[in-house]
Every structure is written in C-alpha cells, then in structure tokens.
C-alpha cells in the first residue's frame, strides 16, 4: 500500500514536471511570436491543454515564467561555455574558439525564440532578475574575451570584448533572418565567418 502511494506520488510529480516543461516551451514560442505583453495566462494554459488559472500551479506569475526562461538560458550558456573551456584545457587556443563558436551556434540555431525574447522583453523582468541575467551574460562574454586574448595576446580586453560582441551579433541575428528550415543550411557560413573574425584577426 505504501509502495503504491509512493509510486502514485512519483507519477504525479513526473506529470507536473512534464507540464511545467511544456509551459516553458509554449511560453518561449508565444512570447517570441507576440511579445511578453501580448501573451495572456489563458494563452499559456491553452497551449498545453489547461486553464489560465491552472498555470499558477506551476508559476506564481507570467513574469516568473519569463524570468525562468531568460535566467535559465543565461546560466546554461555560462555553464556550457565553461564546459568548452574545460574540455580544451591545455590544448590549442584556436580549438577553444572553435568550440565556443560551435557551442553558441547550437544555442542560436536551436533556441532562436529565446534570443528574440531577450532582445525585446528583457526589460519586462523584475530589476533583480534582469541584473542577474546581465551579470551572467557578462561572465559568459569574459570567457570569450579570455579565449581571444590567448589566441591574440596583442588584443586589449576592450578590443577582444568588442570582437566577441560583434560575433555574437552575427550568430544571434539568425532568429531574425532565417527560418527553422534554414538553420542547418546557414550554419556553415555563420561558422566560417565567426572563425574568420575571431581567429583571423590581426
């Protein structure tokens, strides 16, 4: 009896976690398409087959969902960038740059909705969450700055930072200029241009 109750409890938790994941996916899609202010709780609920008020079982507010989307992706980028550096520790500095470019392209081409949301709706977040996102993003940029200076020691931190931001602009432009079906077609060109800009600088 106890085992059955525990199993049922685990199953409920799994279903709740799955619905929460689906709400995040639906939220990313809807907010990217309509903007944060253009999405209602009823829209979020309908996208996963629940009522608007039922969304509160998973998120205390629409803002909380936005926070989880943008804080979450910022932290995943930082963690992923650190993993790239760890994987290439002691290797050719150029391979670190290539690894970072490949990692960021995976993000830009795989989660374009989040780029669009950040570009347009970052200011809709509470101040503390927005500061957290910006702080985490700065840490991510500094990974690139350090990697660039290892390849090109003559670059100042400021120069390396400008180049990193320019390449982010190139890679992050994809959600605004390419459809999902275009993603793999444009990837080789984006990779080539990014590496030329970063590894080929003089």
Where are these regions (language model features)?
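N-terminal intrinsically disordered/low-complexity leader segments
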Residues: 1-18, 202
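Hydrophobic alpha-helical connector segments
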Residues: 68, 82-110, 163
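Amphipathic alpha-helical packing segments from all-alpha helical-bundle domains
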Residues: 75-78, 127-152, 161-165, 188
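Amphipathic alpha-helical segments used for helix-helix packing
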Residues: 108-128
């Amino acid at each position: 009896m106890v085992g059955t109750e525990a199993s049922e409890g685990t199953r409920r938790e799994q279903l709740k976690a799955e619905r929460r994941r689906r709400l995040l996916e639906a939220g990313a899609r809807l907010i990217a398409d309509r903007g944060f202010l253009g999405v209602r709780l009823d829209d979020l609920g309908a996208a996963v087959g629940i009522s608007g008020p039922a969304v509160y079982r998973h998120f205390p507010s629409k803002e909380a969902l936005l926070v989880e989307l943008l804080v979450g992706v910022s932290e995943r980028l930082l963690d992923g960038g650190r993993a790239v550096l760890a994987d290439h520790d002691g290797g050719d500095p150029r391979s670190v740059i290539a690894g970072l470019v490949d990692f960021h392209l995976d993000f830009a081409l795989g989660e374009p909705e989040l780029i669009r949301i950040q570009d347009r709706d970052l200011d809709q977040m509470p101040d503390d969450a927005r500061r957290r996102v910006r702080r985490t993003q700065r840490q991510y940029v500094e990974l690139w700055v350090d990697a660039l200076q290892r390849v090109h020691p003559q670059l100042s931190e400021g120069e390396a930072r400008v180049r990193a931001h320019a390449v982010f602009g190139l890679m992050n432009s994809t959600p605004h200029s390419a459809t999902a079906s275009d993603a793999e077609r444009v990837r080789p060109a984006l990779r080539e241009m990014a590496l030329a800009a970063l590894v080929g600088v003089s």
